């Protein structure tokens, strides 16, 4: 499977809404991803198959300084277990580093611990959370 990865790649709202719905198990929404990403994100990575179909995505928010934050990592079912997710994170880390960030943060559901720690190289750190 040939996959290409692009930092701040072109975003098709329909394709990303469909991928997001498939990956997170909710109905297809009508989010204006392009506007949201350009307004609030340091960058994002789009993964596309040989036909140009969006098969993976990760968003990278930031604090305007040294800290970047991984959000919405998603891979199409048909492309899973082929290293696409880990490659998305590597591309997100490179884009964040190139932008001058020193840290890439992630929070996740416990079931994703092996992915983020083993496949992607994150390490455990103390953090806090308030549900709003």
List where the protein language model places each region:
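Short amphipathic alpha-helix that is part of the acyltransferase structural core
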Residues: 1-32, 46-51
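Small/polar loops that bind or transfer phosphate-bearing groups
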Residues: 8, 71, 107-108
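Short alpha-helical
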Residues: 11, 65, 110-114
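A conserved beta-strand-loop-helix scaffold within acyl/acetyltransferase catalytic domains
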Residues: 32-51, 55-74
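Conserved acetyl-CoA pyrophosphate-binding loop and the N-cap/start of the following alpha-helix
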Residues: 79, 83-91
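Conserved active-site alpha-helix within GNAT-family acetyltransferase domains
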Residues: 86, 98, 102-103, 109-132
